[in-house]
Amino acid sequence: MARYLGPNLKLSRREGTDLFLKSGVRAIETKCKIDQPPGQHGTRKPRLSDYGLQLREKQKVRRVYGVLERQFHGYYKEAARLKGNTGENLLQLLERRLDNVVYRIGFGATRAEARQLVTHKAILVNDRVVNIPSFLVSPNDRVSVRRKAQKQSRIKESLQLSAQREELSWLEIDSSEMIGTFKFIPERAVISGGIDEHLIVELYSK
């Protein structure tokens, strides 16, 4: 399945919630009718079956983290193999993705921008270049911006925007040095996003 290249706001409207695909400079409600699906029949809200609800939740989480279907299914299988709660394991794996950590630290205004920084070799993990967005960050890993990329205005602007977000307990951030430390893997209770991972587990368990 190819990566979606269409309007990001359309995806948020499809899911009926902000998927954080835009920078957040303006509230998403000022840009589109978030509670109305796209298309000429958007005002109609058909009642979803249990399967429909499960599918929508999976699509929502995939789009939030920018992961393709095959890769997402792979994360689920790995989550099911690990000890503990499968749903929590799944979200923890997604949170450990390098592009997500770069976004959470604030180097990228969106996960898509963070992914681009990674693929363009602007990001270091423990002082070594890593250009794989799906690379899983481990506790105590240091994620930083390469010195020659630190002059990019978009990174500076993103850090200013991220200062307005809620601080995350599992990250230690030094904005002036453009360094973030992934202190520990977050527990489910502190991972935000309005996600019901149980629906995804039910979907894949069939």
UniProtKB/Swiss-Prot annotation:
Keyword RNA-binding attributed: yes
GO biological process, one term: translation
Gene3D superfamilies assigned: Ribosomal Protein S4 Delta 41, Chain A, domain 1, RNA-binding S4 domain
Alphabetical UniProt keywords: Ribonucleoprotein, Ribosomal protein, RNA-binding, rRNA-binding
Residue ranges annotated for the S4 RNA-binding domain, each copy included: 96-159
InterPro entries referenced in this protein's UniProt entry, alphabetically: Ribosomal_uS4, Ribosomal_uS4_bac-type, Ribosomal_uS4_CS, Ribosomal_uS4_N, S4_RNA-bd, S4_RNA-bd_sf
Superkingdom, taxonomy of origin: Bacteria
GO cellular component annotations of the record: small ribosomal subunit
UniProt keyword RNA-binding, yes or no: yes
One of the Pfam families matching this protein, by short name: S4
Molecular function per GO: rRNA binding; structural constituent of ribosome
NCBIfam families to which the protein is assigned, alphabetical: PRK05327.1, rpsD_bact
Subunit organization: Part of the 30S ribosomal subunit. Contacts protein S5. The interaction surface between S4 and S5 is involved in control of translational fidelity.
Family of this protein: Belongs to the universal ribosomal protein uS4 family.
Function: One of the primary rRNA binding proteins, it binds directly to 16S rRNA where it nucleates assembly of the body of the 30S subunit. With S5 and S12 plays an important role in translational accuracy.
The protein's name: Small ribosomal subunit protein uS4
Organism encoding this protein: Hamiltonella defensa subsp. Acyrthosiphon pisum (strain 5AT)
